[in-house]
């Protein structure tokens, strides 16, 4: 089990500010050598020195930021789960999540991440109004920045959400 190669965005959590572009591919030396010989000819493989510096600068605070991300997400998930206007919260840190025990074994004391899914009760108009009225949270697609973001999928997008999709 496991992955032969892992591609990771350095732009998101590792940089932490969303102001640098970079990525990394991690894997066995033989596979990395193959990538260097083949793919890098087509797509390039050198990060700019300035982006490398900014990512290195951001990586220093990564453990502190991730702990805060997970702590905040846990508190927000618990708050939303108890809100009568929220239909469901999908977050593995909640005891109500169907895979909570598995997540607890796998993540231990490290927390359950900074992302969750939830649904606001009501029709499409009510849900759109909820997103439009947010003052501190930005409606945008990304993650790992120094701001909170929301992506409104809604029942028409991505095949629709159910309480706990299988």
Walk through the language-model features, giving the residues of each.
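Conserved PLP-enzyme active-site core in the AAT-like
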Residues: 1-85, 90
């Amino acid at each position: 089990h496991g992955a032969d190669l892992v591609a990771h965005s350095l732009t998101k959590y590792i940089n932490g500010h969303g102001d640098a572009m970079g990525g990394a591919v991690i894997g066995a030396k033989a596979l990395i050598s193959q990538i260097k010989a083949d793919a890098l000819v087509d797509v390039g493989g050198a990060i700019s020195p300035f982006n490398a510096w900014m990512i290195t600068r951001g990586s220093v605070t990564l453990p502190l930021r991730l702990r805060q991300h997970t702590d905040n997400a846990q508190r927000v998930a618990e708050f939303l789960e108890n809100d009568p206007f929220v239909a469901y919260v999908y977050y593995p840190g909640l005891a109500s999540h169907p895979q909570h025990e598995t997540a607890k074994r796998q993540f231990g004391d490290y927390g359950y991440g900074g992302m969750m899914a939830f649904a606001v009760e009501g029709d499409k108009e009510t849900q759109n109004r909820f997103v439009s009225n947010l003052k501190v949270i930005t409606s945008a697609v990304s993650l790992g920045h120094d701001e909170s973001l929301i992506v409104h999928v809604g029942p028409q997008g991505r095949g629709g959400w159910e309480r706990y999709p299988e």
